[in-house]
Amino acid sequence: MNNSYYGVDIRTIDSIAMADLLSQILAGNIRKEDREELEAQGRMPYGGLYESMTTSIEAYYAIHENMPLAAFGIGLCPEGCSIWMLGTTMCERHKKALVACMQDYIKDSLKKYKVLTNYISKDNTKALRVIKKMGAAFGEEVETGGKTFVRFTLKE
């Protein structure tokens, strides 16, 4: 998926060393919403990023002018395939590029995997709005770490 969107390049995370470096960089400036979701799951930003990148069946990062903005990918879960994205505070400045990228990524991923799912904190209203615009259906709610998460599902 090595593409470019409005000056934001998308590259494959293709090594443990790259995952480690990206996790360190992204964790230092992670979005408040992502930090809170990770902490509710009992994970710190570096660990959550690193685990997501290294256990996924595919993982990518978005970069602008040599500064990583976000990482995203697909991991396996009991329900099938779990799509995820964790980003920095710089994501807001590059929202148009990242939304276009994720629209393409979801479309391509649904062709391969048919169904994508995950949970988003109900407090993460921006992410819920975006994923809804991309066609997500919302389902069960679960409590973890003092936060309510809602399950979303995307289907081909």
Question: Which residues does each predicted region cover?
Answer:
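A short helix-loop-beta-strand connector motif used in the catalytic cores of GNAT acetyltransferases and
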Residues: L49-Y61, A70, K114
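A short beta-loop-alpha structural element at the N-terminal edge
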Residues: N2-N29
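Conserved beta-strand in the GNAT
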Residues: Y61, N66-L76, C81-S82
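Conserved beta-strand-loop-alpha-helix junction that forms the acyl-donor binding cleft
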Residues: Y113-K132, E143-G146
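Conserved acetyl-CoA binding element of GNAT-fold acetyltransferases
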Residues: E79-C91, V150
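Conserved acetyl-CoA-binding loop-helix of GNAT-fold acetyltransferases
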Residues: R93-D108, R129, K133
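Conserved GNAT-fold acetyl-CoA-binding loop/helix
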Residues: I30-L49
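C-terminal "cap" of GNAT-fold acetyltransferases
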Residues: T144-E156
